[in-house]
Amino acid sequence: MKQKYSKLPNGYLESIDRGIRAVRHFRGGLTEGILSRDEAISRLKTEIETAEAIVIGADAGLSTAAGLTYSGERFLKYFGDFAERFGIRDMYSGGFYPFPDAETRWAWWARHIYYNRYVPAPRPVYEDLRNLVQGKDCFVITTNVDHQFQRAGFDKKRLFYTQGDYGLFQSVNPAIRKTYDNEEWVMQAMEAQGFVRNEKGIFEMPAGGSVSMKIPALLIPKCPDDGSDVTMNLRADDSFVEDEGWYRASAAYANFLRRHEGMHVLFLEIGVGMNTPVFYVLNPIRPKMAKNSRFYPENGYFIKELSRITDSERLRRCA
């Protein structure tokens, strides 16, 4: 796959390289102004209105604002049995838990995938963000793997999910550089555990409140090409499969940046923490400012953190 797409521009690798150089460039010389909430909203609104293009860089904080929380009440609602039996405290750590058998491990993952990939987010933050940039020349690059941008109506051809997708499996056989849609399997595995659909078609706990923590052995997912085991298509190490869709999205992102050099581009970074890979992945933004003055400050504008205005009410105030 890498050889097949070697001639395409790789926005992912370019971004990492530029990000590292940008960190070195700005080290010790970067200051951030402090704006009031109203000032920040007003400034963002102005930049959105005047920008010729917008690049949205999003990390887990955006999905958290949308209600896709991995701990607390939501976790206990769907994983209370796993918490009680294994002492798991949240969905994130549960993904690394050494379950006793494959039937239990895949029961966990069926729930994890379903409630973070195949159901609407509790709050319409993604939809509000889409409405906020409606009609603008926009591209999204994100480390989120929950598919929420697409669910909210963002253009699939202008999305780059750098770290994978909960909706995809990959083979453990490193020779197979493909991914496989898992929706049908997830629905079967949820039914096998005893979850029932409500009036909206969403799986919920049955009236008795008890479900199985295992799936049948025959339902353990296998690679359709060679029958090998599968795993999640999530970037955990160098075994992560960058498939055809990944390479095309990477090229589309790189081309979008090149097409808009010298233009007034708003780089909107939302929910991004300093300890996540997205800090480097999303950083064609900062090196562009360092390397090319046409991007900043005369033409471009970079908003680093919008955690104060990522809920629906405040996003609507920008519209």
Role assignments for model-derived ranges:
Residues M1-A319:
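Conserved catalytic alpha/beta core of Sir2/sirtuin-type deacylases, generalized to analogous enzyme cores
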